[in-house]
Amino acid sequence: MFPNILDNAIVYFYTQKRNYGSVFYDNGKIEYIHYLAICSYDNNEYYLFHCNNKFEVIADYIFDSIEECKNMASKCKKDIVWIKNNCNEIY
């Protein structure tokens, strides 16, 4: 089950496990992106999180809206299906 919180941010939308690319580090390490999530710390800005298979955030991008996050993600990967996290209504 996808976590409700990532890096202390509330998860609003997430994806099923899939190949969303990879992150290459300067030391030669490669991490694969298995999940995408749209999160917020304060509801003023939204983050597009790239997560590994352990739900750890390995890259993030900041946007002004959820729609901007979704639009950016769709430029990199087509046919993304977003799942609304209904648990965030309690926060």
Regions found by a protein language model. Give the residues of each.
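Short aromatic-glycine-(Arg/Gly/Cys) micro-motifs in beta-strand/loop hairpins
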Residues: 30-58
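Mixed-charge, Lys/Arg-enriched low-complexity segments
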Residues: 53-91
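Intrinsically disordered, low-complexity boundary segments flanking structured domains
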Residues: 1-2, 49, 70
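Negatively charged, low-complexity tracts enriched in Asp/Glu with abundant Ser/Thr
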Residues: 1-29
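Short linear sequence elements within intrinsically disordered, low-complexity coil regions
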Residues: 17-19, 25, 30, 51-54, ...
